[in-house]
């Protein structure tokens, strides 16, 4: 049985959930991404996860009010959600956190009061070894604490609910190199290239296979899926949803990625945010998917166990 652990940064440890079981009902709704048929688009990502009566907000978009505005337009009430997952520390995934916490807590003091991140989220960043470290994340941590929020930093996979896993830091077995910057990060071992070591993904274990939800997948989609299959369950990939940072990938890299996804039994793919547009179409072709099972994700697009991909006119 996989060990379950979470390191509380502000207070306490994550509670050990009941024994693992398959998630039976899942709906994932995109609340922030580049394309929008309804609501507002932005360079960022956020999604609402609803699974067996539980709700989790995954990432919070770039601008303070985008996710809240889009949710209101879609008549989605986020105030009942206490758990938020931040896939990594970039501001296009964390930018909405404070405003969401402040606004939603007016209706429910527990709204978005527990933020899950992976180890490395709070590492100091700098553009070069001689420059002063950025304080953006330190400020975010302090401001979130002032709202009554708690950060929970995980150094390994943790079950948030039965069958719903946050992977923690993901080993970089394949050289996918899915990051853009040339900055540096201060780690316990010293100054290193900032390859976004805290990048993490959410995994839902269903009886049809695993659903993988990523913000940017800086660890690499194949590294992420292989780690999920190792630590959660060696099962087919029922769906991969989110940003996968393939926008600059070569055709050879995309073909390799698509072949691996095909080997993993990928059934559904929604590539949003930094995935790019052409990469989605190439994966559709090379992985043997269709217009119904592989789309460029837009604001308001959904995936459910019952109906599969529910796309708007823009992304269908």
Name what the model sees in each region:
Residues 38-40, 54-83, 106, 178, ...:
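Pre-active-site segment of Zn-dependent metallo-hydrolases
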Residues 1-8:
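Bacterial N-terminal signal peptides
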Residues 148-153, 260-316:
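Binuclear metal-ion centers of metallo-dependent hydrolases, dominated by the metallo-beta-lactamase
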Residues 65-117, 230-241:
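Active-site metal-binding motif and surrounding structural segment of the metallo-beta-lactamase
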Residues 178-181, 187-236, 242-245:
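Active-site-proximal loop/helix segments of hydrolase catalytic cores
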Residues 57-61, 82-89, 116-118, 212-216, ...:
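Active-site neighborhood of phospho(di)ester-bond hydrolases with catalytic His/Asp-centered motifs
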Residues 27-74, 195, 199-214:
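Conserved beta-strand hairpin/beta-sheet module of binuclear metal-dependent hydrolase folds
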Residues 120-200, 295-306, 312:
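Metallo-beta-lactamase
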């Amino acid at each position: 049985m996989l060990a379950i652990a979470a390191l509380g940064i502000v207070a306490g440890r994550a509670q050990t959930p009941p024994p693992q079981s398959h998630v039976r009902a899942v709906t994932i709704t995109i609340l922030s991404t580049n394309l929008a048929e309804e609501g507002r688009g932005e360079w960022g990502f956020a999604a609402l996860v609803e699974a067996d009566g539980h709700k989790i907000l995954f990432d919070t978009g770039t601008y303070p009010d985008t996710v809240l505005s889009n949710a209101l337009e879609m008549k989605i009430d986020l105030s009942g959600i206490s758990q938020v997952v931040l896939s990594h520390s970039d501001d296009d995934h964390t930018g909405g956190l404070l405003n969401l916490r402040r606004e939603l807590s007016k209706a429910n003091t527990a709204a978005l009061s527990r933020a899950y991140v992976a180890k490395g989220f709070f590492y100091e960043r700098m553009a070069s070894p001689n420059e002063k470290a950025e304080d953006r994340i330190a400020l975010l941590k302090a401001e979130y604490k002032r709202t009554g929020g708690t950060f929970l930093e995980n150094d390994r996979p943790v079950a948030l609910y039965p069958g719903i896993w946050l992977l923690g830091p993901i080993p970089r077995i394949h050289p996918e190199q899915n990051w853009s910057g040339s900055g540096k990060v201060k780690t316990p071992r010293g100054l290193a290239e900032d390859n976004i070591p805290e990048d993490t993904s959410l995994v839902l274990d269903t009886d049809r296979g695993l659903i993988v939800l990523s913000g940017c997948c800086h660890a690499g989609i194949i590294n992420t899926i292989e780690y999920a299959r190792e630590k959660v369950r060696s099962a087919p990939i029922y769906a991969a949803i989110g940003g996968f940072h393939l926008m600059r990938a070569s055709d050879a890299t995309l073909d390799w990625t698509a072949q691996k996804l095909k080997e993993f039994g990928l059934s559904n793919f929604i590539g949003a945010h930094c995935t790019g547009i052409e990469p989605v179409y190439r994966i559709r072709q090379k992985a043997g998917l269709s217009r119904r099972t592989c789309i460029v994700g837009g604001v308001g697009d959904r995936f459910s166990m019952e109906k599969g991909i529910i796309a708007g006119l823009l992304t269908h």
